[in-house]
């Protein structure tokens, strides 16, 4: 009996670490995962830059001024640092305010942890947030002794920017699985840039030689993978802001291929934003942080605020209100990256009608959108199971109005209210279908009601037609001379409304067949004009469609 108890206890003692490791890997492993190589598609990422951006704008100055008035607090060893601290330091130095106070403050602080996700075996993890955020202090003010005192600069290098040397890694500390994308980018960009600064300032120690210590090769390969297979934490709320800031640091301060790949990724994700946003309204599906519900705000996400800053530097007369996200917007306000001309054009004013599918690779869902000068119809996507960490959204119609929240928009989703069960990819050019009702915002007046269709005027010659019942919602954008002509065109092309559950002949000529009960990893659309479409999400190209 005693021997059995000993065996039992030994089994438990040896098994618990393995169980812990497996559990963390399964439930919390948020590192990059890649599948097949994504095709680029038929739409190129714009690169041409001719816009003469201004050096300052009212929005930029407001952001810097906001942070220059912030409060700084002392750091406690082992505790996460309030990220308002580095932003306030940057704001003050950028504004040239509170210089003595900020220098004395920095001299009292020391690193409180190490890089990587915080967990049981890495209880002081998460310091990469701080290292990434303080990196611009060194590069922007290291040669300005009137702002960053020499003694403070030395202390910053030795005691605050402590992620350095060799040791590039993608992994969560003390594990064999990959850390999250934003953690890797924050930690390894901070390591790379500190090493680079040390070498440029006379430290020839081999451990700081990025070209020979594995750091440059590792970071370059990681960035190349992101560019080739797609951003894993696409549109992430809140982590996109930290990924973005890391990439902007590399664009501003790195050299060679590391800088080039960081810039390519920025160009790629900004093009995605330009196509799937409308006047800074942006409500795409995203990966991480997984939540049981999603924000209903349709403006001022962490990507929008970046474009708002750059738009203000292009045209300071634009009416832009950054109500949230100033912490992320600071990076756009202080660093030199600027989007390509076409990105700004499509962000601010859609030049023509278009339809685009944008793939996000392994175990993901695509972004699909269709728009014109006066509207954008944006598909909500589909969750791939809790471990995919994807939060999908309703399919939304953005109009040229003052809407700020989901309830103020035309939108549709289904079946039911649990977004985990939705497949909101029933979407093609100027057409959306879902196994649920269409929500019509309060106060929207119909231009015509005809045979269960409600016709709303979007702009001159462009109408929204809505069909909505318990398990079927259709939103159709129709170009016609009048609401009556729009309704007649729908009726003439679709004589049997019972077929709405499986097919629709659009007045624009497209014959669309779909399956509202499609699996969550499959595009709801089956065929267009009797030609089967590629329905597998993880095979959809980066950018494909008509623009």
Q: What label would you give each PLM region?
A:
Residues 47, 118, 171, 175, ...:
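Generic preference for well-ordered secondary structure
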Residues 138-240, 244-274, 279:
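Eukaryote-skewed repeat-based solenoidal scaffolds used as protein-protein interaction platforms
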Residues 248, 259-325:
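Extended amphipathic alpha-helical segments with heptad-repeat/coiled-coil character used for oligomerization
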Residues 21-186, 208-219, 310-547:
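Ser/Thr/Asn(+Pro)-rich, low-complexity disordered segments
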Residues 13, 18-19, 59, 223, ...:
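Alpha-helical protein-protein interaction elements
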Residues 55-59, 64-65, 72-81, 90-91, ...:
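Catalytic cores of extracellular degradative/oxidative enzymes
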Residues 1-22:
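N-terminal Sec-pathway targeting helices
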